[in-house]
From Swiss-Prot:
Coiled-coil portions: 108-137
Bias-annotated ranges (Polar residues): 488-508
Entry keyword annotation includes Cell membrane: yes
Primary location: cytoplasm
Modification Phosphoserine occurs at: S46, S62, S366, S582
Disordered, as annotated region: 488-534
GO biological process terms, semicolon-separated: auditory receptor cell stereocilium organization; cell adhesion; cellular response to chemokine; cellular response to mechanical stimulus; chemotaxis; establishment of protein localization; muscle organ development; negative regulation of cell adhesion
Protein's name in the database: Rho family-interacting cell polarization regulator 2
Compartments where located: Cytoplasm; Cytoplasm, Cytoskeleton; Cell projection, Filopodium; Cell projection, Stereocilium
Subunit details: Homooligomer; homooligomerization is regulated by RHOC and leads to the formation of concatemers through the association of N- and C-termini. Interacts (phosphorylated form) with 14-3-3 proteins; these interactions occur during myogenic cell differentiation and also induces T cell proliferation arrest. Interacts (phosphorylated form) with HDAC6; this interaction occurs during early myogenic differentiation, prevents HDAC6 to deacetylate tubulin and also induces T cell proliferation arrest. Interacts with DYSF; this interaction occurs during early myogenic differentiation. Interacts with MYOF.
Record's function text: Acts as an inhibitor of the small GTPase RHOA and plays several roles in the regulation of myoblast and hair cell differentiation, lymphocyte T proliferation and neutrophil polarization. Plays a role in fetal mononuclear myoblast differentiation by promoting filopodia and myotube formation. Maintains naive T lymphocytes in a quiescent state and prevents chemokine-induced T lymphocyte responses, such as cell adhesion, polarization and migration. Involved also in the regulation of neutrophil polarization, chemotaxis and adhesion.
Any one GO molecular-function label of the UniProt entry: 14-3-3 protein binding
Length: 1078
């Protein structure tokens, strides 16, 4: 350890006893190194860099420009570290998209931590039971103490998760208020100018500014709960790049945090560095920038490379070993071991002052006083006392009181909260937040009546459409490998938590009151089972789709019975909708299938819903963005998918809501605040006399008197549908609109499923094309498939835009289908009238059996089912026939069906089935024969007569994987002889190279052996990529195949062998694009 290095005490959980080097944090303004800006970054799986050499140079220059700042004296490093640690600087502009991404990643990491410790706790508890009979008292005491330590740490993790959820819920509320204020600004800007309008606009501008400040303050508070990253230097790796005596300097920048270290390559191949590890504090808006420079002399420095890396994937419970491509060619890689701790050093270190020690002791006693193994965790009951100060109640009551009394929007700023007061609300909470026994006693059912509902109209809240960003940022790919976790490190982590201090927050999961129920309605029987709901703020906006008819009120609404809810089961509005949708209700005809349809079809369809449209779009953009400039087909696909995304976000009034057809007026802009009406039910005052029944308040929505209802509707003329609108906004039940967290939908379930399937297939094709980009003939074949998908996306966008998905004829979706009447007639039998766009694989095979099984079994007994499964796998572009058990979950779209037969020139299904039957018969023969008969059969079959069909090629390749050397040699000689036919060799080479891009490991291994038999030197580049697989068996087979391909293969293998193999799946780069993942 060089001089000047400082030590920290053990870092939280897993690093007890490990010295940690302080980060060299300079108070220099952070550079804006994201070319697309934080808002231009979609959710990514990669620790990545931004492509483009010019952007790289600009980032490198920004480091060089700060060279003078780097030479500042470092006498106050610890103080600077503490300043950065607390991060008191609030951002100037909120970044809601980035906050959502970081929140999801943080929540997953915390859940992973909790799951890991729960597993360890179960293991120790079982061990304790086994040891009680024959162990000494001292051993039992130590084990019991260890169990209690883990329990305390788990409670702290659960409390930390609740604080994060609280902040995120408050952030979402402020974001929606900001959106509402923005719409109000637009409404007043387009309305006739007057003095009152100008005054109201001024007030709204102030409100908008305060909402923005609130969001920024919450972002800063959330950032302080992200924990810390411990980064350990593992060294540089590179082929023909690292020579003895070379000196390198690595400079890492993360916001205001800096780390610079120098290293030298020794003669024996080892590396010496002046810094071993450092600590970086996670940021919400910020990426790690890494610059590597080679030091040649006093004034000669050569820039090796500079990358900017994503950090979301670093929120994991286990240490991760990552390999970062530094230069464009990927010949220099930086190996780091990164460990994330959910609690930072200062949180786990007792304060030095006597007063602080006392406060810390009190908080510790408050947090851990119930420390027996039998104390329930948050999974069993809530440990929070409901705090009566609620951000939501303050905003809601103020807003509706203003509307009710003043009938003016000029007082909207009264909705805002002071940013400092908001922070104090979350930071200065009482210490004694945990209760041991009151939670279970306070749990009481809540009964609500829906007699307020009279009108049958169901209005869903609308929102202005926003187009997705046309350009997305690309990140360098980085490989992640979990490091080993020792038992001693776990113990040290848990023991380190005993000195931790606790904070507290209000509980969003329960209330200890019982609002008044409808006096005239009957209560639900207490014996009936409750509704299973998802608790916690993680599901603040549920992504579920429900028919509008389930939310419409009937004429006999007054006869509806009250709904019994549980105040400890999370958001009450969500429970209401869950209960409504789970009860018997009217079912629309477009949701039903005709009699005789496959029962699992609807289940298979539902598996693609629940927000999967957004997931499919995000997954496609994630795979496409780093490479969209590489091929013209990628650019065309990006254009069509973006257009389709815009169409779904800009649905006309008929498929969205009644209010979306209104012009943007002040009245319609006020609908943005409807979520304040029913999004939560805050506690009434204890005496029950101070309840404010303001028009538009939560109580008035479910009130029993016509006076209150008419009073509220007189304030807002559009109030008839506000209940259903508010339910849609707060629960995610209903149709998504742009700018809202509700799920996308076309309004037709079958069309939604079809879009998801094709988006997923395009994502798969993109990954295969990128993998085979260095082998042109393979990439060209895959690009042809992608071009057909681009045309499908055009048709899907047209159908979604013009007809709103309400098509009852396949010809309307594919006009060319009328030219293939036999195929059209068969598809009509397979799909239901309510789902013309898709059919389940089981239903398709059932119809094939009814139509063609007899003729096939007549010539080839028992072969009908394998033939049909093979056909389905070909339509779906699968590597091998589907298993019978997976048929019910597979979905075939009408575009897949039509595209397959069109691309293969098939106009008559029966003729094609006859050809396919002969192929399957040959495959069955080869697979069923024993080794001696197999050799005889292959000797009788002339290689020149061998059909170059994928089923035959796949079977021959799989025969090469048999343990029998004689069979393998015979198949090898057979393929070598058959490859003399140029047509056969071309088809076989294309199939086997495409098989290398599939996810089937057995098929990849077989394809490598087949390419070895064909002596396919054209596949060298793909085999080089496959040699970096994370599966040892695949790497071995690919390496052997490389070495068998002559001098070119041997040279490629020697170059590959220079790279270290301790890091899994090290990615490469394509052109100027970075392709490495964190």
């Amino acid at each position: 350890m060089p001089p000047g290095t400082k030590r920290l005490r053990a870092l939280g959980a897993f690093s007890a006893g490990l010295p940690t080097r302080l980060p060299e944090i300079m108070l220099v303004g952070s550079q804006s190194f994201s070319p697309g800006g934080p808002n231009g970054i979609i959710r990514s799986q990669s620790f990545a860099g931004f492509s483009g050499l010019q952007e790289r140079r600009s980032r490198c220059n920004s480091f060089i420009e700060n060279a003078s700042a780097l030479k500042k004296p470092q006498a106050k490093l610890k103080k600077m570290h503490n300043l950065g640690h607390k991060n008191n600087n609030t951002p100037k502009e909120p970044q809601p998209k980035r906050v959502e991404e970081v929140y999801r990643a943080l929540k997953n990491g915390l859940d992973e931590y909790l799951e890991f410790h729960q597993t360890e706790l179960d293991k120790l508890t079982a061990q304790l039971k086994d040891m009680k009979r024959n162990s000494r008292l001292g051993v039992l005491y130590d084990l019991d103490k260890q169990i209690k330590t883990i329990e305390r740490y788990m409670r702290r993790l659960e409390f930390h998760i609740s604080k994060v959820d609280e902040l995120y819920e408050a952030y979402c509320i402020q974001r929606r208020l900001q959106d509402g204020a923005s719409k109000m600004k637009q409404a007043f800007a387009t309305s006739p100018a007057s003095k009152a309008a100008r005054e109201s606009l001024s007030e709204i501008n102030r409100s908008y500014k305060e909402y923005t400040e609130n969001m920024c303050a919450i972002e800063a508070e959330l950032e302080s709960l992200l924990g810390e990253f411990s980064i350990k230097m593992k060294g540089l790796a590179g082929f023909a790049r690292l020579c003895p005596g070379d000196q390198y300097e690595i400079f890492m920048k993360y916001g205001r945090q800096r780390w610079k270290l120098k290293g030298k390559i020794e003669v024996n191949g080892k590396q010496s560095w002046d810094g071993a590890e450092t600590v970086f504090l996670p940021l919400i808006v910020g990426f790690i920038s890494i610059k590597v420079t080679e030091l040649k002399g006093l004034a000669t420095h050569i820039l090796v490379g500079s990358v900017t890396c994503e950090t979301k994937e670093l929120f994991a419970a286990r240490p991760q070993v990552v390999a970062v491509d530094i230069n464009d060619l990927g010949t220099i890689k930086l190996n780091l071991e990164i460990t994330w701790y959910p609690f930072d050093v200062e949180d786990t270190t007792p304060s030095s002052g006597p007063g602080n020690k006392t406060a810390a002791l009190q908080r510790r006693m408050s947090m851990y006083s119930q420390g027996t193994p039998e104390t329930p965790t948050f999974k069993d009951q809530s440990f929070f006392r409901w705090l009566r100060l609620s951000v939501l109640s303050a905003l809601r009551d103020t807003f509706f009181a203003t509307l009710h009394h003043n009938h003016s929007v000029g007082d909207l700023p009264s909705l805002s909260l002071n940013p400092k007061a908001l922070l104090e609300f979350y930071s200065n909470l009482p210490d004694d937040i945990f209760e041991s026994g009151k939670a279970a006693e306070e749990k009481r059912p809540l009964s609500l009546s829906f007699s307020d509902l009279q009108d049958g109209d169901c209005v869903f809240t609308s929102s202005s459409a926003t187009s997705p960003s046309s350009s997305h940022s690309a990140h360098p790919e980085i490989t992640i490998t979990p490091a080993e976790l020792t038992h001693s490190s776990l113990s040290s982590q848990n023991e380190g938590t005993e000195d931790s201090s606790s904070a507290s927050s209000r509980n969003s999961l329960g209330e200890d009151h019982e609002p008044k129920s409808h006096p005239k309605s009957d209560t639900v029987e207490p014996g009936k089972p409750g509704v299973a709901t998802r608790s916690g703020t993680e599901s603040l906006f549920l992504e579920s789709s429900v028919a509008e008819a389930l939310l419409q009120e009937s004429d006999e609404a007054s006869e509806l019975k009250p709904v019994e809810l549980d105040t400890f089961e999370g958001n009450i509005t969500k429970q209401l909708v869950k209960r409504l949708t789970s009860a018997e209700g009217p079912v629309t005809t477009d949701k039903l299938f005709f009699e005789g349809s496959v029962g699992s079809e609807s289940e298979a369809g539902r598996s693609f819903l629940d927000g999967s449209l957004e997931d499919a779009f995000n997954g496609l953009f994630l795979a496409l963005d780093p490479h969209k400039k590489q091929y013209k087909e990628f650019q065309d696909l990006n254009q069509e998918v973006t257009h389709l995304d815009d169409v779904l976000k800009c649905k006309p009034a008929g498929s969205r809501s009644r209010s979306s057809s209104l012009s943007l007026t002040v009245e319609s802009a006020l609908e943005s605040f409807d979520f304040l009406n029913t999004s939560d039910f805050d506690e009434e005052e204890e005496d029950g006399d101070d309840v404010c029944h303001v028009g538009g308040g939560a109580d008035s929505v479910f009130s029993d008197t016509e006076t209150e209802k008419s009073g509220y509707r007189s304030v807002h003329p559009e109030a008839r549908g506000h209940l259903s609108e508010a339910l849609t906004e707060d629960t995610g039940v209903g149709t998504s609109v742009a700018g809202s967290p509700l799920p996308l939908t076309t309004g037709n379930e079958s069309l939604d499923i079809t879009i998801v399937k094709h988006l997923q297939y395009c994502t798969q094709l993109i990954q295969q094309i990128v993998f085979s980009s260095k082998t042109p003939f393979v990439a060209r074949s895959l690009l042809e498939k992608l071009s057909r998908q681009v045309l499908v996306m055009q048709k899907l966008a047209a159908v979604s835009d013009e007809n709103l998905g309400n098509i009852t004829s396949v010809v309307e979706a594919i006009p060319e289908f009328h030219k293939k009447l036999s195929l059209l007639a068969f598809w009509t039998k397979c799909c239901s009238p309510s789902g013309v766009y898709h059919s389940s694989a089981a239903r398709l095979i059932k119809q094939l059996e009814a139509s063609f099984a007899r003729s096939i079994n007549k010539d080839y007994p028992g072969l009908a089912e394998p033939v049909f499964r093979t056909l389905v796998s070909q339509i779906l572009d699968r590597a091998e026939p589907l298993l019978s058990s997976s048929l019910s979950s597979e979905v075939i779209t009408v575009f897949q069906y039509y595209s397959f037969f069109t691309s293969h020139g098939v106009s008559d299904l029966e003729t094609y089935l006859g050809q396919l039957t002969r192929q399957v018969a040959m495959v069955q023969t080869l697979q069923s024969l024993r080794d001696e008969k197999l050799l005889q059969t292959m000797s009788d079959l002339a290689p020149s007569n061998l059909p170059a069909q994928q089923e035959v090629l796949r079977t021959l390749a799989l025969l090469l994987t048999r343990d029998d050397n004689e069979v393998s040699e015979a198949v090898t000689l057979y393929l070598a002889a058959a490859s003399k036919n140029e047509h056969f060799r071309e088809k076989a080479l294309l199939y086997y190279c495409e098989a290398l891009t599939k996810a089937n490991l057995q098929l990849q291994k077989a394809a490598c052996l087949a390419l070895k038999s064909l002596e396919a030197t054209e596949s060298i580049k793909m085999l080089v990529t496959l040699c970096q697989s994370d599966t040892e068996e695949i790497r071995t087979v690919a390496s052997e195949t490389l070495l068998s391909l002559g001098e070119d293969g041997r040279l490629a293998y020697e170059q590959l062998d220079k790279f270290p193999r301790d890091c899994v799946k090290v990615g490469g780069r394509h052109g100027t694009e970075v392709a490495t993942a964190f």
